[in-house]
Amino acid sequence: MPAPPPDARSFLAQALRLVPCGGAAAILTVRAPEALPTIRASRFFMLRREDGSAPLIPRPYSIYKQRGAELDFLILRQGQGSSSLLALQAGMPVRLIGPLGNGWPDLASPEPAAPDPGASPADWVLLAGGVGSAPFYMAIEQALAGTFGGPVPAHRLHFLFGARSRAQLYDLPAFEALGVPVHTATQDGSHGRRGHVLELLESLQREGRIPATVRALACGPERMLEAVHAWSRRSGQPAYLSLETLMGCGVGICNGCPVPTDKRGPLRDWPNAKACVEGPVFRADAIELCH
């Protein structure tokens, strides 16, 4: 299996600020010692405080935004690791290891191809659940700018954001300012439509507001990704899933993040893939998820 990416590094960054963005989440901004090359959206870093007050094992976080040497991470308070990061003060050191993993595919590519060989490439729907929104801000930015391939017109990108309630639609105004269609769904009906994000997609397709044939990117809770995986299999519409998987090392050594592969898919030669190396982004037809 592949080794960790050649551009991965371990370095100390400086915490700059924490900005609340809804519920128990905040955006952590850190500054690396020097400007970093542009990083493909949905790659991640392992983060850990360096003052001895945090768990020894770092935590994986997708890059939310990048501005030269400055990196933003969307942090949700969940346990000791995230709580220690949310207690950082400006100027404190943070250990970063990365960038790690792969990222979203080139959204300007005609692949995966439409079922009709003569048809235009299908629109993309970006399905986010809660903090699963983290890898999508840069994905949209990079697609619009043509950072990795040609630019994608804004009307060909549809961002669908689902959460339990309005408070978990983290940093929603920032996504609305990107200029792509944004649709929301909440389980309690406090913002957008009531229901789950996949139900939102199917409703918008029935109404003709999103084409019947699309290509999907998805990141969110396990049950949401299982539903998107099943939808892709059922409908034949291609999807890429960015898994929110627990990781021990992030570089493929500990074997703590196995993902069962589909024996008919592109990773069929291996019984399991490593989420930190072959992922976190997988084609839906490459892996098996429990339903």
Regions inferred by a protein language model and the residue ranges of each:
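Short, low-complexity, intrinsically disordered N-terminal peptides in bacterial proteins
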Residues: M1-S10, P112-S120, E207-I210, G265-P266, ...
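Short, surface-exposed secondary-structure boundary micro-motifs
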Residues: E50-G52, P99, D262
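FNR/FR-type flavoprotein reductase catalytic core
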Residues: S82-L246
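Local cysteine-cluster metal-coordination motifs and their immediate loop/turn environment
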Residues: P135, E222-R223, E244-P280
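Structural signal for conserved beta-strand scaffold positions within catalytic alpha/beta enzyme cores
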Residues: R17, K65, T184-T186, L241, ...
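SAM/dcSAM-binding transferase cores
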Residues: K274-V277, A284-H291
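Ferredoxin-reductase
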Residues: P2-A90
